Amino acid sequence: MKKIKKAIIPAAGLGTRFLPATKAMPKEMLPILDKPTIQYIVEEAARAGIEDIIIVTGRHKRAIEDHFDSQKELEMVLKEKGKSELLEKVQYSTELANIFYVRQKEQKGLGHAISSARQFIGNEPFAVLLGDDIVESEVPAVKQLIDVYEETGHSVIGVQEVPEADTHRYGIIDPLTKNGRQYEVKKFVEKPAQGTAPSNLAIMGRYVLTPEIFDYLKTQKEGAGNEIQLTDAIERMNNDNQVYAYDFEGERYDVGEKLGFVKTTIEYALKDDSMREELTRFIKALGL
């Protein structure tokens, strides 16, 4: 069985929920404290043993490439000024993994974005990490899925429970059998209508997929939003070859919409020793 050493991170979206901030800046570069959100995703992949990462980009996404590239002039200035801690952080962001880029030429959905990286992946199993969710866990969320893949040899989809009122926002699984945190899946449903979801187990932006998924994506018809949906292709693949779901452990932070982004920033700041005390005083002083 081939090891999972490659990952795809889709980053071609327009970031319309954060306009006008994302008119000229990629949504993925919006910072949580002192790191852009996409760095948290790359760090998770690297901690899981991923060596090669392909980031699927679009127009106006050059800042992502610049962030993970080395900046010798900046490093030299930091070194000359004795700012060793900042120098270490800057160098760390360029050494996380081998990072490559491919452009999604049309906005045709997540499934289409994944297809854009087919040549890079070749005939190997691979991971997919979406940038709307930062997950804090002792074992990286995607590593938990990799472990299940290595036990079963089958594709694995990361899920977590969501409130029933929110199920229409996600891909949802219809579980067949349960073994610990692992599920056999009867059906995958992309964004079911309110009140029709078969469960409250939602697909949460972490996948380990076998290369066969590309054949299903190639023939996949447009689905929700008139886009090529990855969930629809996974559903078809599941009909031919079992796809598992795994309820991964970890605290999930939704940074794909404004309120979640603000909540995440506040929580991360409260965990930071240099900010906690003063921020706590500030919040108390608001008298909310």
UniProtKB/Swiss-Prot annotation:
Write the protein's name: UTP--glucose-1-phosphate uridylyltransferase
Entries under CDD domains matching the protein: UGPase_prokaryotic
Q: Which family does it belong to?
A: Belongs to the UDPGP type 2 family.
Q: What is the lineage of its organism?
A: Bacteria, Bacillati, Bacillota, Bacilli, Bacillales
Q: Give the Gene Ontology MF terms in alphabetical order.
A: UTP:glucose-1-phosphate uridylyltransferase activity
- Name of the top EC class for this enzyme: transferase
Which controlled-vocabulary keywords does the entry list? Answer: Carbohydrate metabolism, Nucleotidyltransferase, Transferase
State its Enzyme Commission number(s). Answer: 2.7.7.9
What is this enzyme's catalytic activity, as reactions? alpha-D-glucose 1-phosphate + UTP + H(+) = UDP-alpha-D-glucose + diphosphate
Record's function text: Catalyzes the formation of UDP-glucose from glucose-1-phosphate and UTP. This is an intermediate step in the biosynthesis of diglucosyl-diacylglycerol (Glc2-DAG), i.e. the predominant glycolipid found in the S.aureus membrane, which is also used as a membrane anchor for lipoteichoic acid (LTA).
The record, for Pfam families, names: NTP_transferase
On whether Transferase is a keyword of this UniProt record, the answer is: yes
What domain of life does the native source organism fall in? Bacteria
User: Do the record's keywords include Transmembrane helix?
Assistant: no
